[in-house]
């Protein structure tokens, strides 16, 4: 393990866990490590839904990765139905496991596909959340070794301008 850490492997991949908004998530090299920046997004989303007093919101988490966003929303809103999508089957499997260990699996739907491709056309949501790949391709090599050499490129690379997902 010391050798792994010295080679730049993130501590979270070595231990296999990362805390996110008070919940524990299993992480592996198939998913990004949940970060504090994403907690800001989730905290804002929680505030919006609570202010609107939605009792059973339908929430979509696109590019779910570890499931940190969707699982946290399901945990925060016990009557919510949360749909999580990811293009990576390995990431989706990790999200499923995290939904199970955080006791929200039965209220979550998992769909594999790229962005909205996985969503049935008639499905509607009260809130859509996403932390898609947004780093410009040319910038990735300037990131820390922990990120550029160990986190999944699929989850980082947002194309030439960082907006590949939103431009499509």
Give the location of each predicted region.
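Short glycine/threonine-rich catalytic loop with a Thr-x-Gly-x-Asp
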Residues: 34, 65-66, 162
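A general structural signal for well-ordered alpha-helical segments in protein cores
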Residues: 8-11, 66, 70, 153, ...
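Proline-centered helix-kink/hinge sites
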Residues: 10, 34, 132-133, 152
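Mobile active-site "lid"/loop adjacent to the S-adenosyl-L-methionine
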Residues: 134-165
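Cytosolic-biased juxtamembrane loops and peripheral soluble domains of multi-pass membrane proteins
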Residues: 17, 22, 87-90, 107, ...
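Conserved AdoMet
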Residues: 1-48
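Conserved SAM/SAH cofactor-binding pocket of Class I
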Residues: 40-142
């Amino acid at each position: 393990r010391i050798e792994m850490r010295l080679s730049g492997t993130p501590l979270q991949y070595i231990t296999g866990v990362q805390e996110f908004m008070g919940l524990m998530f299993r992480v592996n090299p198939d998913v990004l490590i949940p970060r504090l920046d994403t907690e800001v997004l989730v905290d804002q989303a929680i505030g919006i839904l609570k202010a609107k007093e939605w009792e059973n919101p339908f929430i979509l988490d696109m590019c779910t990765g570890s499931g940190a966003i969707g699982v946290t929303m399901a945990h925060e809103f016990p009557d919510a139905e949360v749909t999580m999508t990811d293009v990576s089957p390995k990431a989706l499997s990790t999200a499923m496991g995290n939904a199970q260990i955080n006791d929200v699996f039965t209220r979550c739907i998992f769909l594999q596909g790229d962005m909205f491709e996985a969503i049935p056309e008639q499905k509607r949501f009260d809130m859509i959340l996403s932390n898609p790949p947004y780093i410009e391709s040319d910038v990735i090599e300037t990131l820390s070794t922990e990120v550029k050499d160990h986190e999944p490129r699929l989850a980082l690379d947002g194309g030439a301008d960082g907006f590949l997902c939103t431009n499509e």
